[in-house]
Amino acid sequence: MTHTPSTPPEDSLLGPVALKPGLDWSALDHVDTWIFDLDNTLYAAGSRLFDQVHRRMTAFIMESFSLDREAALTLQRDYFRAHGSTLRGLMLRHGLDPHDYLNYVHDIDVSVLPPAPELGAAIDRLPGRKLVFTAGSTAHADRILTRMGIADRFEAIFDIVAADFVPKPAPEVYDLFCSRYGVDAATAVLFEA
């Protein structure tokens, strides 16, 4: 079946929906590995789920360092900018146990996410391997993917622990990911919001 550059083929990921004008679906014909970020990518940012994580980060810093909200937000922002993630800054500057932090910040209400059978069906239509690459923990990803009903669509979850707590976009993290799963970057695509 042929398709125009502005609409995907009917059996494509999104089905017969119009997308950005000029999108050439044939550019993805070589892809055999589909990699998805989790937060605000596999679920809609409009769910405000990650806002819960952000608030929990701030609360963790407030409690750990006896700071008010504004000071905690400043520290959170500064560590993110300087180290690529708040967690990395807390580890490097304060010797923080990352597991305590991850357990705390990911203690959120995932019931705000609806099941996503259409997304599951779309992922099923992608030929090849499907992997999740997240800056969160595997437990966090599992809870979200299970809630959405799409956990079984993915071969593996590569989390911040597997990345040795080095956040994206550090090049060595992508190299580690590709090495661990035998991914050829030339035939892979990463979706990240």
Per-region residue spans from a language model:
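Acidic di-acidic motifs
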Residues: 191-193
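Short, structured coil segments at secondary-structure junctions
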Residues: 42, 126, 150-153
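Short glycine/proline-enriched coil/turn segments at helix->beta-strand junctions
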Residues: 93-95, 126-130, 184
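N-terminal acidic, proline/glycine-rich, low-complexity intrinsically disordered segments
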Residues: 1-9
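Glycine-rich active-site/cofactor-binding loop and its immediate structural neighborhood
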Residues: 125-127, 136-137
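N-terminal helical cap/lid subdomain that shapes the substrate entry/recognition surface
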Residues: 10, 17, 22, 27-120, ...
